């Protein structure tokens, strides 16, 4: 019997406790076509994570360099007020476009990605902030094939 459930839900944990086998999830084949739109959409989640951290009330702009373009995330008093492309050259957050999807979706941590991808980097002591905004979390993508 295949359950097609996350390994983190209560029922799956029960089945595992009864001796069920865990299959590795199939590789993620996800592409975020517009990181700008995606980050706007998850803005309330990012704001909640800030509120529950030492970064409550954050006011600053984060520049994410995606090789061909940069995105600026403007936070004011802990609220994400603007996400848009910027032309300013910045090399503080180097976002490998392929690896960043794993960060945004919680599949890999910032440290995992910095280790695996030399062109994924977080400088100027922003690692902890990125960890708060994009923590590693269990997830499951249901696929229908």
List the model feature ranges, each with a label.
Residues 1-145:
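Intrinsically disordered, low-complexity, positively biased terminal segments
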